[in-house]
Amino acid sequence: MGPIRPALAPWPRHLLRCVLLLGGLRLGHPADSAAALLEPDVFLIFSQGMQGCLEAQGVQVRVIPVCNASLPAQRWKWVSRNRLFNLGAMQCLGTGWPATNTTVSLGMYECDREALSLRWQCRTLGDQLSLLLGARANNASKPGTLERGDQTRSGHWNIYGSEEDLCARPYYEVYTIQGNSHGKPCTIPFKYDNQWFHGCTSTGREDGHLWCATTQDYGKDERWGFCPIKSNDCETFWDKDQLTDSCYQFNFQSTLSWREAWASCEQQGADLLSITEIHEQTYINGLLTGYSSTLWIGLNDLDTSGGWQWSDNSPLKYLNWESDQPDNPGEENCGVIRTESSGGWQNHDCSIALPYVCKKKPNATAEPIQPDRWANVKVECDPSWQPFQGHCYRLQAEKRSWQESKRACLRGGGDLLSIHSMTELEFITKQIKQEVEELWIGLNDLKLQMNFEWSDGSLVSFTHWHPFEPNNFRDSLEDCVTIWGPEGRWNDSPCNQSLPSICKKAGRLSQGTAEEDHGCRKGWTWHSPSCYWLGEDQVIYSDARRLCTDHGSQLVTITNRFEQAFVSSLIYNWEGEYFWTALQDLNSTGSFRWLSGDEVMYTHWNRDQPGYRRGGCVALATGSAMGLWEVKNCTSFRARYICRQSLGTPVTPELPGPDPTPSLTGSCPQGWVSDPKLRHCYKVFSSERLQEKKSWIEALGVCRELGAQLLSLASYEEEHFVANMLNKIFGESEPENHEQHWFWIGLNRRDPREGHSWRWSDGLGFSYHNFARSQHDDDNIRGCAVLDLASLQWVAMQCQTQLDWICKIPRGVDVREPDIGRQGRLEWVRFQEAEYKFFEHHSSWAQAQRICTWFQAELTSVHSQAELDFLGQNMQKLSSDQEQHWWIGLHTSESDGRFRWSDGSVINFVSWAPGKPRPIGKDKKCVYMTARQEDWGDQRCHTALPYICKRSNSSGETRPHDLPPSTLGGCPSGWNQFLNKCFRIQGQDPQDRVKWSEAQFSCEQQEAQLVTIANPLEQAYITASLPNVTFDLWIGLHGSQRDFQWIEQEPLLYTNWAPGEPSGPSPAPSGTKPTSCAVILHSPSAHFTGRWDDRSCTEETHGFICQKGTDPSLSPSPAAALPAPGTELSYLNRTFRLLQKPLRWKDALLLCESRNASLAHVPDPYTQAFLTQAARGLQAPLWIGLASEEGSRRYSWLSEEPLNYASWQDGEPQHTGGCAYVDVDGTWRTTSCDTKLQGAVCGVSRGPPPPRISYRGSCPQGLADSSWIPFREHCYSFHTELLLGHKEALQRCQRAGGTVLSILDEMENVFVWEHLQTAETQSRGAWLGMNFNPKGGMLVWQDNTAVNYSNWGPPGLGPSMLSHNSCYWIQSSSGLWRPGACTNVTMGVVCKLPRVEENGFLPSAALPENPVALVVVLTAAVLLLLALLTGALILYRRRQSAERGSFEGARYSRSSRSGPAEATEKNILVSDMEMNEQQE
């Protein structure tokens, strides 16, 4: 039962429920009901037009004039998958389409209903309610209800009791901890024990911990996790460092992106791990000892204007970078800690999924942000020194080394400058540094490398690093720190550099207050160059303006982060209050302006601000949101106010804004456009090719390489010009024709220290917004904004999505040429039909590919030995090191691990070095070529290498091939016909499996040859023929040297290589005979089924496929043609129907449902191949039953089945809130659900679904062993984060009550492999619990049963491996078994145990016939019943206490006494394979 362990055995529990009901008690969910009125995400839906609230009444919904917040039937909440849940009905709001009525029916439905009709967009929900309720205007209304259609249509809907719209209470993902779902978010609502839960619950747990299911039905899938809890202690799930009081949570069992991990920590009142001291690093290293993992920490470089920082605002003063780290900071912006390097740090791509570490300080969950404080003291300083905040400062203009500068300061009685706040930094940049570009400060790491400290011995409490800093550039001992640039950012530099410096020393206290008043009136506070006054009356906005004017001042303006820090300090003690500023949206246009008319160059918005409504005035918040800006109603909201009176020069906006202001008369670079009223030029970067689309950070990098920025928008006029520019390029057509065409703009909320608020990447203030009214906008994930071509509004998007983009550049500025450095060949070199250019400067693979595209080229592909030799000869001329690596265009996709050329050409030639390519993995791999050996290898794509571009007139990309001509004729008996070819699979009998040449000879004897697969359609036919094939099959592809070709030299126009293939032919003794031949894989793993692999032609035996043309003298087979629309098609016990007519996705679903079907579910590559033939036959893309949540790229089947198999086109799924279809080439693509496609595939229901095998018993679910995963009759616990010897693995599993992994059949092997493959970065494999029994001369499992199933990898199991000294393991990357030594080797551990049977009451025992015995039994039963009643009441009270947040009874701890053997396990989500098994 997964997380559920009943407090009582099943029979007394049901009996007890009856007794309690008789006694007036009710077993329910006290936490759910008691907290209902306090839940902030629950609301009432109010209709302005009907003057009533929406209420669920049975299966219908009505608008009731009396709104009652305590009535569950009127209480609603948004839940996952964009559904609206009613707390009274415990159902979801939806629509239905009765077969006898064309009117859509609004009502309440079970939340697991298989239809998209339960999903709503919050921005259009009101309109939909008006339309659907208005359709019932003529129906008879119940007494007390109002259903006036005209009123409803014209009415406005909002949250009752507030001015908030229906999008104001969105649903946020809740990420689980522990359990067996590796951190996957809760599915809300979920069903457990035939009841629906709309939030986390402790039901079913004795320990009172809150949990949730991560799929819709817990009873079906048994996937679950604990819910995050914000508490002030570190009792549960945390380790506590007694020395520092910091608490740590290691989530080895979870795999989330950086932003998701950050959100998970935040949901627990914590943050991702920060490490600020050597002691802390040492403590963390101790907790990681014995583990193998890479984990997210809070280190990030997500602020595009700043450097590396901690997400919890800790100062970045200690670093533990590994050698050559950080690398590729432009695209890898998040930090990890690695056990492999003993706690060293690396930077990674923030979007990959990894385990993570949280950190928190107990009793510190709700403290407000501490602003910079101002010392109210006056000091005297020596001549040439300037006073500020109790200290004196002096600029030393003479250029010296850092040490010489320090000695000079010491001679003057001070030390090099230390900086402890933003206010002090402002004083330094404005008053002391002035026009000096760069100078020394006292920060250094001379005592201990990468442990920065101030030379005056003061505590490092504040840091302000420059972008990409500190980096200890190329390990060049940059031990001293400079301050430079207009923002005063910091950079680590070599200490012997000669620069000016600033000295600092304590001032002499004098009488009076600091700075006097500088002319400010009494009660006002001076901050250069103005006086500030806090108005303590709570007034509306117009009164605040008038009151400031009466004092000869204006409402406060805030033009940079320094002024923001000062104003925050003024209001620090006013917790819970708001203060008006001079910022407002005057004309309700969405454009904010200062009352003075100045442009907004700096903003500091709170989360979800300025919101989506137009209009409003801006006030400063206090408390935990100290100083953050929020939009309030100007006429009804009352707040205090801040007046500002300027005494000096006009305020200078903070850089980096567009400063200096660009000219209106400057010209635009070629290809860029502008308007006479605008100061910038604009260019759209758009391509049909997915390879040329970019993530947000990549697009930003492209713009900046050109000397431009991603588009920022400051006004409606600027956006209107951009809209017209897009319309000229893409045409002014209907919005649906532009659906899902998005362009990156510079707006983002990537920086965790900005409180989820939006910022422009070029530093422009966020004063104008044009967001589409987003629905269920998950702030934790979507951190970048796009401009939507269809609506010309903005949409929040996940930053790693690959899209087009728009750049802007100031008028009069020239576009920079690509910075490609010194080039060995300045001209293109021609060879055969192509031209090549060799770039000697080093770039990452992605940057190299981008530079190639600037020349209308691609990174080079290689298709022959002659081309390889040509490249090698030129590389040797340019390479000083003959082992120099050069990038070429071969790379893998993150989605499937398959190699492909960047120019889209087929892989017909390989030249791998020995041992290459490395085993496939999750990370993208890119391929290099060495200069001298001319061989290839693969490595991380972010490595900087020289590279080669190639361009030719012919495109290498493959497109769908035309259908072969319809040829009359048929096939002989025993052959299967497809179009104009006959096929025959041979090798069912193992005796018939032969070497490649023998297979070809056998085909020739049958007047045929080994199969040639010319296009995806033929591949689909063959794959669809494989379900009953249990062996690999030779095909006609072979390689004699390094190139592959078909028999009879047919051109190789199509390939279907498996992930990591082809690995290349072995060296041939002679150049004539093939040494590497291709097979089609039968693998039960969906990633490999039907794919090609190259094998030894002479050492391996396999089945094979023969092929020949049809015989005109024979009649064609009825099954030879492609499927026709309208007909029912049967395949693998499934039935499909093809629809061919223009349909939107929802229309297709309705049409399928009207025919007792649904849009098709594609569970495996066999069904995919079958449907590929259907799409190709109709020459049209076909809708399938796959759709995403609104605003998300997470796609799921209508049937709620997990997406275990996918056939996405490269770069897909691209669209958020979209629907999926099978394209004519068989791949899946996504588009707007409102797009009209030319057809769909229905999956026809034939009676009730086949029964699912149910297995008795459950898996352990305690806090310390919660990650057991059920599969068939057993439970499995994966410990890939632990590396143990074979003996230790046996001991660990024995302590858990199980055994080391045994694998009894291929299905179980695939199940295990799916888990290990996802965690291969932690462990190369896991131990198998087998050993050699010398008495029987055989391998046996731990229970001494013989090993009857095996999956040995090449070269197989030799006699030398059959001994007591041999141990055996399963490889993470391939699922193959390997023999090896038992000692000095560590592997991951997988423990296995049978499901635990639950002891239940057996009702078959009859009552005794003896009356005395009967009395005794009845008396005992009554006593037992009373005891159970008492126990139940105690349990009920305990649960009530637990559900109020008390975890007093929980004593889980992963403390120092519990080493890795007792640690929480790292797990990967299991596929629901067991759910699909059918009884034989």
Curated annotation (Swiss-Prot):
Glycans are attached at N101, N139, N363, N1028, N1348. The lineage of its organism: Eukaryota, Metazoa, Chordata, Craniata, Vertebrata. Its main location: membrane. C-type lectin domains 3 to 8 are not required for calcium-dependent binding of mannose, fucose and N-acetylglucosamine. C-type lectin domain 2 is responsible for sugar-binding in a calcium-dependent manner. Fibronectin type-II domain mediates collagen-binding. Residues 31-1413 are extracellular. The chain crosses the membrane at residues 1414-1434. May play a role as endocytotic lectin receptor displaying calcium-dependent lectin activity. Internalizes glycosylated ligands from the extracellular space for release in an endosomal compartment via clathrin-mediated endocytosis. May be involved in plasminogen activation system controlling the extracellular level of PLAUR/PLAU, and thus may regulate protease activity at the cell surface. May contribute to cellular uptake, remodeling and degradation of extracellular collagen matrices. Residues 243-359, 388-504, 527-643, 677-808, 831-950, 978-1106, 1131-1242, 1271-1391 form the C-type lectin domain. One of its GO terms (molecular function) is collagen binding. It is found in: Cell membrane. Interacts directly with PLAUR/UPAR and PLAU/pro-UPA to form a tri-molecular complex. Interacts with collagen V. Interacts with C-terminal region of type I collagen/COL1A1. Residues 40-166 form the Ricin B-type lectin domain. The keyword Chloroplast does not apply. Residues 1-30 form the signal peptide. Residues 1446-1480 are annotated as: Disordered. N-glycosylated. Phosphorylated. There is a cross-link at K1141 (Glycyl lysine isopeptide (Lys-Gly) (interchain with G-Cter in SUMO1)). One of its GO terms (cellular component) is plasma membrane. This is C-type mannose receptor 2. It is a single-pass membrane protein. The keyword Signal applies.
